[in-house]
Amino acid sequence: MKKFFCLSIFICGLLLSSCSSSSIAGSILSAKEGSETADGRMIDTEASKITGNSDSTATSTPTPEPTLTMTAAPTLTQTPTPTPSLTPSPTSTPTAPDLVSFSYSDLHQGVQPVAYIEDPCDYLISRWDEDKSAPGTIVVPIMFHSVAKPGREITDSTTISVAYLDYFMERAKTLGFSTITTEELIGFLESNEKIPERSMILILDDRRPGVIEEYFMPYLEENDWTLTLAWPTTDATSNSLWERMESLAETGYLDVQSHGHDHIYIQDYTPLEEIEEEVYQPVEVIQSHFGTTPRALIWPGGNFNQISVQLAQEAGFKLGFTVFSRGPVMYNWIPLGPQETAMGAPLLVLPRFWSTAADAALEKALQIGEEARVAAEILKAEELAYIASYCQPQDGD
């Protein structure tokens, strides 16, 4: 009985061993044939490629079974999720809105106001500085030539009568205008330096000492006004004329500026050396005879081109005047036609009214100045808010 029991145990052990081997072999075979991915594709383990789930059975060349090295699965430690906290983001500078520019509908066709202050903060801070010129302040540049004596017939478009000059001067006073110098105009146009709200710059072209002495000087002395001279410095000037002009300049009523050297009308075909002489030579001559450096170039005949404007900048001129009656000028507001605008230097191609319509120029300027003042008041709150938002100094400035 004992022998029979031992034999039974031995037979059962053999059967169990056979089942276990078959099961392991089946598992290995199944792994070799492939496994199915989550998207229904079959992975061919031996061929190391992905094939589509197909009803056909691929025939492959048996390869030696790889030796599988069992490694322990890594233990995954869950990292706790940190509690989100609010961290300040770097302060970014918001985009500043576009500023509204003053426009005037009654300018001549093709004439547009040009702004020239690049930094809007510089412009607005100067515009609303109480120690500077108020919005609506205007400057009227006026060009004079000959003044005809009583009884003389006027046959050209640049000469005015004594009677008209007298009328204009009285009208200017009645309207509250006064004169400014070139330096004052530069300060106003560049940084809105304070000048009279109704200003004019009277410019007498060419070499006319008699006109100065007989017709202008009485008004200059009476009103403490200044006359700007557009003076050609030609080599043909006599010593006696120089002495006469130097004596007049000593009165303090004259503001001598350049009108070229030989009064050449600059054209695109004008030789470069002639343009250079027109621009550079007067600087030295005026310094020699009047002890001042000219800061304005009144273009001879009103002619200029890109080369002459560039040379004027290099020579140190801050202003230039044409013969175009475009309108009065204001801070950061210069009315220009296409020819002047193309130069890219608004302050070197400023407009001038002709003396034959000088009184009308003053009336028009007052209208423009008043509209500009009203427009500025409407925009004041918005522009002050702009300054507060975008023009404050940053840390480290």
Provide a role label for each language-model segment.
Residues 9-14:
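Hydrophobic helical h-region of N-terminal Sec-dependent signal peptides
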Residues 89-203, 210-211, 267-296, 301-397:
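C-terminal active-site subregion of NodB/CE4 polysaccharide deacetylases
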Residues 216-224, 237-257, 313, 340-343:
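Acidic (Asp/Glu)-rich catalytic clusters
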Residues 16-18:
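C-terminal motif of bacterial Sec signal peptides marking the signal peptidase cleavage site
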Residues 1-4:
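Positively charged n-region of N-terminal signal peptides that target proteins for export
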Residues 245-262, 275-279, 286:
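A structural motif
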Residues 22-127:
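Ser/Thr-rich, Proline-interspersed low-complexity disordered segments
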